[in-house]
Amino acid sequence: MSSKLIPNLGATSAAGNWVNWTPTLTNITLGNGTVIAKYRQTGKSIELFFRFTLGSTSSITGSFPTFTLPINSAYESYANGIATLSDANGSKFLGWVWMSASSVWLGVSVANATYVYDSTTSATVPFTWTSTDSFTVSMNYEVV
């Protein structure tokens, strides 16, 4: 397989190689936390990986923590990716992502006595976010 350069990515990379990007965060205070944000493009398809780990001065505020995409999407989509929300105590929760043309919102799946349903992620849902808690997003989408 030969490599080919993809124009207008903001970084020089061969097709299929991972590229780091710096997303804009909303309802997330980075503080001394860490972000891993990378993607790779093959044709019009983007594979994205994002992980945020809270430090002692980090926080989740408001509802639906959000980060910007590295390249705008061709479509808006609901539940087009999967998220894992990890509490420092070892508990893990299944999350979902909703995408606009330029951003990703993080939600969580919640169970009641009968159903599993989607809920808003916030400073206290699915747990109260503290140091070493994290969320990881894996998703694919199509660019314009």
Residue ranges and their predicted role:
Residues 13, 27-30, 62, 67, ...:
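N-terminal compositionally biased, intrinsically disordered segments and leader/signal-like regions
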Residues 32-92, 136-142:
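Beta-rich globular "head" domains
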Residues 1-32, 74, 136-144:
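Glycine-rich, low-complexity segments
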Residues 76-144:
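Conserved, charge-rich beta-strand/loop surface module that forms ligand/interface-binding patches
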Residues 30, 39, 60, 97, ...:
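Sterically constrained small-residue positions within well-ordered secondary structures
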Residues 22-26, 49-55, 112:
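Generic short beta-strand segments
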